[in-house]
Amino acid sequence: MIEVPDYIYERSVIKQLYLKEESRHLFQKNAYSVSISGGKEDAQFFAEASAVLTFKENPILKEEDLNDILRKLMCAGGSLEEMRVEIVFKGGFIESELRQFSSSLKQVADWLGAQIIRVSVNLCDTGEREQTVFILGSGAIKSASEAPWKRGKLYAGQDIILTGSLGKYGMTKLFSENIEELRAIYPEPYIEKLKNKRADRLPIIETDTAAFYKTTAMVPLGPGGLLAGLWSLGDREKTGLMVYADRLSYEQETIELCNHFNLNPLMLDSKGAYLLATDMGEELVYALRNAGLRAVCIGRATEDKKRVIVFDDEERFIESPKYSY
C-alpha cells in the first residue's frame, strides 16, 4: 500500500475542504496530528468512537454514515467535535472520486459542526476495486449535571426504560434483502408501507430529557438486539435484571417477518432503540412520550445476579449474546 502523492493530496483533499492557511499544518498523512480543539476548558475526559465504511464506487459521505459514531458519543455523554479520517483506494485509483469524497466530508463536518483534524489517503493496487473509509470521531464528555448517564452505572432497584422499537432496523434489512420473496406473499400496499420504514434514529430526545430524571446509564442497541444490550448492561455492572416480555415494544411488521423467517425478535438488530437506567422510571417515560417518543419501562435491576426475561409464569435466562443481522 502506498500513499497518494502530495500534489494529488493538495488539490483533491486540501482544496476540497476549503482549509484556511493556518489550519493546513494540522494535516499529516503518516500520523495523527495533535488535537487543538480541547472542548470545554474544564473538560478532563474525551469520548471516542469509530466507524468503517465500504464503497464500491462514488465514495460520497452522507450525514447518516456517521450515525454509529454519533450515537456512541451521545450515549457516553459527549458530542462530536473532531474527526480523523483515512480512506484506502483498493484495486485502482480515480482522482475525481477522491475529490468527491473530500467535498462530501467537508459538507458532513460542517453540518455536524465538527472539525476535521486529519485526512489520510492510501492506495492499494491489489484486490477488488473498492474504497474503505475509517473514521474516528471524538469530543469532550459533558459534566455530570449535563450528562449523568456518562458513567454508565446501573444500581439495584432502578427502572430499565426502552425507547424506540425493538428489531425495527433488522426488520428493514430483512425486507430490503428479501423483497421479491415477500412480494409473492404480501399485498402491494403492505410492501409499499415497508419500503417507507426508517429505523436508524439518534438519541436526541433521550439526551435532551434524561438529565432531569436521574438517568445513570444509556445503552444503544444494535446487532444482537435486546438480549445483547441487556447482557452487556448487566454484565458490565455485575447486576441482575428482571425484564417482562409483555412490556416489550415491537412493530407488527417486525413480528410478522420474524415469524416468516423463523427469527427471534429479541435478537434482531435494534439499532435506533436504546436502554436507559433511572431512579425515576415513571416520570422519565411520561416525559419521553410527551416528546413524541415511544418509551416503556420493561423491568428493573435487581440485587441478585440473575438476569431473566419473564414470559407469563416462565423465567428465561438472558444468555451471552449471539446475534442475527
List the predicted regions and their residue ranges:
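Helix-biased detector of long, well-ordered alpha-helical tracts
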Residues: 1-325
